[in-house]
Design a protein with these regions (language model features):
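Histidine/lysine/aspartate-rich catalytic loop segments that bind and position anionic ligands
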Residues: 166, 175-193
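ATP-dependent adenylation/nucleotidyltransferase module used to activate substrates
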Residues: 2-176
Length: 193
């Protein structure tokens, strides 16, 4: 997988949402190809839409299916990709087979993301994708998110974070783009409920 140096610029906080969107699209255009981890939430859906718009068929959105992922979330993703014509695939992950995940400790999300990114790493290598990205935003850095550690370990990119995009800005830009996920509430996986 190609290494990519993330750009964090303090001036991004002075940019308008539209300027941050332009920065995001410029960053995405630098990739020869990209896999986007698409959960169906507002952030990952916006990232998938932006990557598809910039990269076309060079972008592939991928959703992991497992017992932790709800049928409702799957239906949301199916509708989203059908409506927007986003290139997409479902894959299976097996985090439930990991005793550390099943222990249900505070870092459970780490093991889920580690499984997801391991499967996506293999997919990227086998199919020649240059990078993997996920939909973490600038607000997510304020919370305890064990999945971020897995992303760092797997060198997964965070284009929304790199563009300085916050959740309200992503919702605004998603609404402007007509994305059906713009106002989708954040929800935990079935293992967290």
């Amino acid at each position: 997988m190609n290494a990519f140096v993330r750009i964090h610029v303090e001036e991004q906080q002075q940019l308008s949402p539209s300027e941050k969107e332009l920065l995001l699209k410029q960053q995405l255009s630098a990739f020869p190809s990209l896999i986007v981890a698409l959960s169906g939430g507002a952030d990952s859906a916006y990232l998938a839409w932006a990557a598809h718009g910039v990269m076309g068929e060079r972008a592939l959105s991928v959703t992991a299916l497992s017992p932790s992922y709800s049928a409702h979330d799957r239906a949301v993703v199916e509708d989203f990709v059908r409506r927007l014509g986003v290139r997409h695939e479902f894959i299976e992950t097996h985090e439930m087979e990991n005793p550390k995940y099943r222990a249900n400790a505070a870092d459970r999300c780490y093991y889920c993301k580690d499984e997801l990114f391991s499967v996506l790493d293999t997919m990227a290598q086998e199919r020649g994708f240059g990078a993997i990205a996920y939909g973490v935003n600038a607000d997510d850095t304020l919370d305890f998110r064990p999945g971020h550690r897995a992303a760092r370990e797997h060198r997964v990119l965070a284009p929304l974070l790199d563009a300085g995009l916050h959740k309200p800005e992503i919702r605004l830009l998603s609404e402007r783009a007509g994305l059906p996920t713009w106002d989708r509430p954040a929800s935990a996986c079935l293992s967290s409920r």
